[in-house]
Amino acid sequence: MAKWVPALLLRRVPLFSLRFRPASSTFLPVLAATEPAVSVPSGDLSMPVKTRAEGEDDGFGEAGDPRRLLERPWRFRGCLPGKGNRDVGFEGTEGPTSTRPEWVWSCRCCLGCRASTRERVTSPVRAAGPQPRFTDRETEAAAGTLAHMGFAPPTSFSHFTDQELRDCSSLECLGVVEGDPHVLCSTLSLSRPSPSATLTLLLASSCLLAPAPPSFILLLFTLIAPDLPHS
């Protein structure tokens, strides 16, 4: 393990082509339980997302209005883990249909960076429900990134189970999205998702690019390295 851990500490691995795409249906329940309610000020796209206080008018109509935001949508923080250049931000509207509106935001910066621009998404958004998890191109990009880091990647990532996807969703919300490596490390220790799901989550996030103590990275790979094939 000593031969590749130092490389992780010194090397900034480009992750812009690796995207992790769990089904929308696995994300919404987790987000609803962990993220505070937010709203977007209309008119000025440069303004940051703010937390909406209890009972505050969010500018999208009364409760039940199809334009209204989810009570607890995903907080926009730039490049969200696993979203890449795809649409990010708000996951739906309040009501029985849970449809995603046209005014969701799209991140146009590379995967893993901390800054971004925002613009309205005019194209239709994918419907909720099971989705293809990885395209051939994404699998190839993920395999290349793993090989660059010294691992022999699996030939396909389509073998992930629904439980593994749910594990990744939970880990993203609890650790990576908050940018706290200690929280992520504790979550990994408790939930113990499969090594392949854990590694893919980490590569698809900005976790390894953010400042992290060496002890965190060592413990992190202690959890997943025993079951990983090496090239």
Curated annotation (Swiss-Prot):
Extracellular side: 26-200
Transmembrane segments: 201-225
Annotated region (Disordered), positions in chain: 39-64
Localization terms from the record: Membrane
Main location: membrane
InterPro entries reported for this sequence: BBLN_eukaryota (IPR005374)
Membrane topology of the entry: Single-pass type I membrane protein
Protein keywords: Membrane, Signal, Transmembrane, Transmembrane helix
A single Gene Ontology CC term: membrane
Endpoints of the signal sequence: 1-25
Cytoplasmic side: 226-231
Top-rank lineage group of the source organism: Eukaryota
Name of the protein in its database record: Putative uncharacterized protein FLJ37218
